[in-house]
């Protein structure tokens, strides 16, 4: 009897036994590997999670810094624009009493007197020149009457009964007001009409 023909006590050839054992080992190995978790895999997963979290924090930080820089740039531009726009405010405030004095001089001047006509004309020209210059720099005079009272540009001093002007409208100007580029630098002192 040759070795190939020899049977094992169970009646199987040795090659069959080896094949059966090999299949059993293969069947057992996946279960064993599923149960065994390599500690390095856990560490890698943990490090990957930490890396993703750090990248998210870094990305958020970069976005926050960019937003802060953009806001700072905008605020700086606005501050510079306001500084240019309203740099003359202090100077204009110093000129207002001079303009008021020229206005009062014209109000009290005797325009009917021929001897005073040259002086009145000089005051008028000086006032006109000064107002033209300040207008070039964004100054506007608040002196309209018969317009609704605006607390942003008018300061009511008195209320006077009137049939000619609607109630709540400006009846008269006691002192002119001025704005610089839309900002009130001095409110006009006015009398306001009220119903009889």
From Swiss-Prot:
Residues 1-39 are annotated as: Disordered. GO terms for cellular component: cytosol. It comes from the Bacteria. It comes from Escherichia coli (strain SMS-3-5 / SECEC). Keywords: Chaperone, Cytoplasm, Stress response. Participates actively in the response to hyperosmotic and heat shock by preventing the aggregation of stress-denatured proteins, in association with DnaK and GrpE. It is the nucleotide exchange factor for DnaK and may function as a thermosensor. Unfolded proteins bind initially to DnaJ; upon interaction with the DnaJ-bound protein, DnaK hydrolyzes its bound ATP, resulting in the formation of a stable complex. GrpE releases ADP from DnaK; ATP binding to DnaK triggers the release of the substrate protein, thus completing the reaction cycle. Coiled coil: none annotated. Its main location: cytoplasm. It is found in: Cytoplasm. SUPFAM superfamilies: Coiled-coil domain of nucleotide exchange factor GrpE, Head domain of nucleotide exchange factor GrpE. This is Protein GrpE. The lineage of its organism: Bacteria, Pseudomonadati, Pseudomonadota, Gammaproteobacteria, Enterobacterales. Belongs to the GrpE family. One of its GO terms (molecular function) is unfolded protein binding. Homodimer. GO terms for biological process: protein folding. Gene3D superfamilies: 3.90.20.20, Head domain of nucleotide exchange factor GrpE.
